[in-house]
Amino acid sequence: MGGYMLYFIINEKSKSGNAKQIWKEIEEVLKVRNVSYQAFVSEYRGHAGKLATEICAMDDNDICLVAVGGDGTANEVINGITDFEKVRFGVIPTGSGNDLARGLSLSKDPKNGAIHILNAMKKSREDTWCMDLGEVSLGDKKRLFAISAGIGLDALVCKKALKSTIKDILNKIRLGKLTYLVLTVQSLFTMQTADAELFFDQEKGLQKKRMIFTAAMNFKAEGGGVPMAPAASACDGKLSFCETAGIPK
């Protein structure tokens, strides 16, 4: 398989626990094709990133690292990768929003996703598609993001989604992506706004009164497909910004 070792990091709790069965289906594809692989299960928040770091350290050769989970799992894995020169990163989406997979036009079918990854591994390094990543800095701490990074409403909604029972309920009836819409409407009328000042490339700050949110977008959509930045591209070396301020809630 093109000289690459295949590693999987699986969040079995994604898709309200259904990802465990999805992984079994993926394994069937791997076994039929006689693929050598290693699988690691993420057991708690932040574990996927730690597993990615450990995998990068245990193999000096080029590897293919696949996240089986939602956008959160994929982002953890990305932040755990220590050497992007030797790692090919893949995603098999099993989450609620799946904005990363949607932005990359990946198959929703796990088996087809696995087959696509196996076929891509046969290609040369030059055929690898490069994706931009954003970086957020706070003091001496830095974190990468694949889809978006925001403050205000969208950040609040993401925080609520981590603990919301609504997400589990909607996932069970295959309406998981509505989680973010429900929580957005709920939060919009209760959240506090704040005055802010935005700076772009050392330009004079832009004053924003009663800011509701600001999001730096690497892909066109977030929150389960909401088109926040229709012109955004993850391969142009730029971030797009979307902000709302000064309007009545």
Where are these regions (language model features)?
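Short, solvent-exposed amphipathic alpha-helical segments in soluble enzyme
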Residues: 23-26, 82, 162-163, 230-233
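Internal anion-binding site segments
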Residues: 200-205, 209-249
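Glycine-rich beta-strand-to-loop/alpha-helix junction loops that act as flexible
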Residues: 12, 68-70, 92-94
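ATP/NTP phosphate-donor binding region
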Residues: 1-65, 75, 79, 115-116
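Short glycine/serine/threonine-rich phosphate/pyrophosphate-binding segments
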Residues: 48, 72-77, 99, 131
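Catalytic core of DAGKc-family lipid kinases
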Residues: 33, 83-90, 94-212
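Short amphipathic alpha-helical segments
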Residues: 20-22, 77-81, 102-104, 227-228
